[in-house]
Amino acid sequence: MYSKFGQFIDGKWQQAEKKETYDVINPATEEVIGKASKASSVDVQKALKSAEKGLEVWKNTAPWQRSYVLRKIADLMREKKDVLAKWLTLEVGKPLAEGVGEVGGGADIFEWNAEETKRIYGQTQQSRFPDTRVHVYYQPVGVVAALIPWNFPIVLASRKISTALAAGCSVICKPDTITPGAVMELVDICKEAGVPDGVVNLLSGDPAEISNELMDSDIVKKVSITGSTRVGKIILKKAADKVQRVTMELSGHSPFIVCEDVDINKVADIAITGKFRNNGQVCISPNRFYIQENRKDEFVSAFMDRAKKLKIGNGMDEGVELGPLSTAKRLEEIEKLVETTKNEGAKVLIGGKRPSGFNKGYYYEPTVFDDVKDNFTIMKEEPFGPLVPILTFKSFDEVIERANDNDLGLCSYLYTNSMDQAHRGSELLESGCVAVNTGVVALAEAPFGGIKQTGYGREGGSGAIKDYLNVKYTHMGLKI
């Protein structure tokens, strides 16, 4: 399946210099999907030169032409949604319907940035001197390294590629080795849409080797990474050596707060969708469930009734709602965390094991814990899987304090019919994104990102493009 691709450098698919490959595994079957091309140092250097050349073309391309190309990419993504979604199911394991939704979200991001490229506004300020003028310009930062994770390869590649292109930058994409095909297909669409040679490049292979060499180069001026906080800190240290600009969206550990005055059935529906999307392997997945104590039993009953009905299986099969975890390592880590949580004193209400009837595949049942305390490991570390710890709270102020007692700050969820609590919660919760009475967070038109050790910078919304632009100020005398 990967034979038509390889490394994408200077507008062409080409095999890696050393002709090396690596296996890509289908998490639903544990079978090899195919062998993907593995880049060497020679390929990285070729991509850097290609991106440097492409930058000179793209930054001098008129914004309206850049907008046209970005819009064309969005249109092609929608036309080829089934092809892209199939890659997501084969490589990530998510159900086809979820894959189609992800492709739609990625297309929306390209469409949004197609318009943003027309709206890079400068400024003219009144000078203190009558015979001078003050002008402010925004110019592309340069070559961007886009480090793309495996859990949402299409939508996260779309955020990075489209914003870079809108700003007039060229980009080198590095997909994860778990999911290279999805990003390769997207890059092929960029070529079909008319992106000039060298403007978008792709390197597939060892993540650490490629990232290190890209960041060691003076050509790369900005890095955008979505990944774990551990990896983000490594990238940040590397970026410091070259003073490269960095956008970082790292780990999350979202609280899900349910107040006593809500419709429990509606909230349970939102919780099921949010928690088990991509089998919990989502940076904004609800992970810490705080239920006001007098509604706890009702919520747990409603939630478990729905969780038990989720159809587990291969995402290619009709009606499947919960696919496998993405790797054998991820499955092992979930099993280890379940045992740790039980040993710390939690009670398993449902799940806690691999489902029966599957000889192959990295499947795990939706798992709900009771008798959980705030100091348990599962409350401190992002599980990245279908695990649901249930806790209770008495007062609103108490739960806000407990929800904020974490080093991560990507997203928070709050459900209440009190306008006072809704407004105070949105202001007091320590996260870059807050969802009040909705489960929808990631929108093309909204700034997505976190605070604390979740990182900094934003993707989406009207401000994201500024992270890909340099500010230039000119103080101009009218004569001399």
Predicted regions mapped to residue ranges:
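Short, well-ordered beta-strand elements within core beta-sheets of diverse protein domains
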Residues: 33-39, 54-60, 146, 256-259, ...
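Residue-level signal for inorganic ion chemistry
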Residues: 30, 66, 88, 110, ...
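ALDH superfamily catalytic-core signature
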Residues: 230-373, 436
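Conserved C-terminal structural/oligomerization subdomain of aldehyde/semialdehyde dehydrogenase
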Residues: 29-35, 220, 257, 311, ...
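Hydrophobic face of amphipathic alpha-helices that form TPR/SEL1-like repeat modules
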Residues: 1-28
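Glycine-rich loop-to-alpha-helix module at the N-terminal edge of alpha/beta enzyme cores
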Residues: 31-120, 131
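Structural signal for hydrophobic packing residues in well-ordered secondary-structure cores
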Residues: 55, 59, 74-81, 85, ...
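Rossmann-like NAD(P) dinucleotide-binding subdomain of oxidoreductase/dehydrogenase enzymes
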Residues: 122-266, 393
